[in-house]
Regions:
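The N-lobe alphaC helix and its flanking beta3-alphaC-beta4 segment of protein kinase-like domains
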Residues: 114-142
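Short beta-strand micro-motifs within the conserved protein kinase catalytic domain, predominantly
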Residues: 150-159
Length: 206
């Protein structure tokens, strides 16, 4: 008999939660560094096929001094919903210094969390995207770690806050748990070891 069969879902009475009081306030971080977003349609060169495509929904950082961007993001399919908007997949483009065909496709992918400023102001959710940006940029200063998700770029325009991150082709752990349910012990040990490692990194850095 499986002794853990009854542990399909954790549960707690409301009184138990109430006794513990409200959640602790998040740690204070410096204000996040958010650049200005430029969204354009442009010609893109594909080095694999040598084709030139007219592409829409390209986003890059507009520098105040007028210098050209190093990279751009070709925003594509929707991956999932989030509290303030959606998460979409992107192809990273590199700048070619060619006025007629300014961008070139690379093999690198990204994910962008597109959050509506209107929803951010109206919902007043405990998960503050601006604090999330500041926290992720702060942690990224400590260097790279395979289990720490940093940001590639954080941009904004009048309508949206855009957080560009590395693309994880297998999704996230929450989605994996939703799909697979309860893990066998060896697999749970594998994931939990990573959680402990990243917790140690974050605590040590803070």
């Amino acid at each position: 008999m499986d002794e853990l069969a009854f542990l399909e879902n954790a549960s707690a009475a409301f009184e138990d939660i109430e006794e513990n009081g409200p959640a602790a306030s998040p740690l204070p971080f410096d204000i996040g560094n958010i650049g200005l977003a430029e969204r354009v349609d442009a010609a893109v060169y594909n080095p694999d096929t040598h084709d030139v495509l007219e592409v829409s929904n390209i986003i890059y950082e507009r520098h105040p001094d007028g210098r050209p961007p190093e990279r751009a993001y070709w925003v594509g399919r929707k991956l999932k919903k989030c509290i303030f908007g959606v998460v979409k997949a992107c192809t990273i483009l590199k700048f070619r210094h060619d006025l007629k065909v300014p961008w070139e496709v690379t093999e690198h992918k990204a994910a962008v969390k597109i959050m509506s400023w209107q929803k951010i102001r109206e919902l007043r959710h405990i998960e503050d995207p601006q604090k999330e940006v500041a926290a992720m940029q702060f942690v990224s200063k400590g260097g790279t770690h395979p289990h720490v998700m940093g940001t590639l770029d954080v941009l904004q325009d009048e309508e949206y806050l855009l957080m560009f991150m590395p693309f994880c082709s297998s999704g996230d752990l929450f989605g994996f748990v939703q799909q697979e349910g309860r893990f066998p012990e060896p697999l749970a040990r594998y994931w939990f070891k990573q959680i402990l490692e990243v917790s140690y990194v974050v605590i040590s850095f803070l």
